[in-house]
């Protein structure tokens, strides 16, 4: 699940011209600019290729521009993903393990990167197609297990999104209690390393 998010629905691209894709992408960018920060509760449902529910969960989700991300799964098994703009931390309390990754390498492989990026270079890597109140984001080159992300809005507010992977699984995330990040909430994006945990610092392995 963590890999599906970091690296977490189709309309045929033959039906759309490049100009339409560009317009759809700009519309999505404009909507996300209006969502410079967001905190919400989420409910998660994962279905397999046969549309059978294989996992459910709930927790807290937050994002802030630029490049800050918080994901706290509280049920059924606790886990955290925190991006502070430079590094991405994945914490598994049950395994007592923390994995640290370079943020850009971890998140850029996924269409979900567009939720926290505004730069042209990142957006040029994805095709965006509008579908009523939703936008499907697909990488132009498949470099990860994520095939697409669909984000949906209600009254200009991010309401839900889903992630489709190459195994045929679909992870649906429905948001509630949406609100802007407060000064107090900014602490969510600063990961505090717990005591007595194993640390797998993968930044060293990818350092130049």
Swiss-Prot record:
Keywords: Chaperone, Periplasm, Protein transport, Signal, Transport
Pfam families: LolA
Transport found in the keyword field: yes
Cellular compartments annotated: Periplasm
InterPro entries tied to this protein: LolA/LolB/LppX (IPR029046), OM_lipoprot_carrier_LolA-like (IPR004564), OM_lipoprot_carrier_LolA_Pbac (IPR018323)
One of the record's GO cellular component terms: outer membrane-bounded periplasmic space
Annotated disulfide bonds: none
Main subcellular location of this protein, as a coarse class: periplasm
GO biological process, one term: lipoprotein transport
Keyword match Chaperone: yes
Domain of life, per lineage: Bacteria
Position of the signal peptide: 1-22
Family: Belongs to the LolA family.
Quaternary structure (record): Monomer.
NCBIfam families on file: lolA (TIGR00547)
Summary of the function given for this chain in its UniProt record: Participates in the translocation of lipoproteins from the inner membrane to the outer membrane. Only forms a complex with a lipoprotein if the residue after the N-terminal Cys is not an aspartate (The Asp acts as a targeting signal to indicate that the lipoprotein should stay in the inner membrane).
PANTHER family per the UniProt record, alphabetical: OUTER-MEMBRANE LIPOPROTEIN CARRIER PROTEIN
Entry protein name: Outer-membrane lipoprotein carrier protein
The gene coding this protein: lolA
């Amino acid at each position: 699940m963590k890999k599906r998010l970091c690296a977490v629905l189709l309309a045929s691209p033959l039906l759309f011209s490049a100009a339409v894709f560009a317009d759809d992408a700009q519309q999505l960018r404009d909507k996300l600019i209006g969502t410079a920060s967001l905190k919400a509760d989420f409910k998660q449902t994962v279905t397999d290729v046969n549309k059978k529910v294989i996992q459910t969960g709930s927790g807290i989700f937050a994002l802030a521009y630029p490049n800050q991300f918080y994901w706290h799964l509280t049920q059924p098994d606790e886990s955290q993903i925190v991006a502070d703009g430079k590094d991405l931390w994945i914490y598994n309390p049950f395994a007592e393990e923390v994995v640290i990754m370079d943020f850009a390498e971890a998140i850029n492989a996924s269409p979900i990167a567009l939720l926290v990026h505004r730069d042209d270079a990142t957006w040029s890597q994805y095709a965006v197609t509008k579908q009523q109140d939703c936008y499907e984001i697909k990488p132009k080159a498949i470099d990860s297990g994520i095939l697409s992300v669909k984000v949906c809005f209600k009254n200009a507010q991010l309401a839900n999104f889903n992630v489709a992977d190459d195994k045929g699984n679909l992870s649906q995330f429905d948001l509630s209690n949406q609100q802007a990040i407060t000064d107090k909430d900014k602490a969510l994006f600063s990961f505090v390393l717990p005591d007595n945990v194993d640390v797998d610092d993968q930044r060293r392995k990818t350092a130049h």
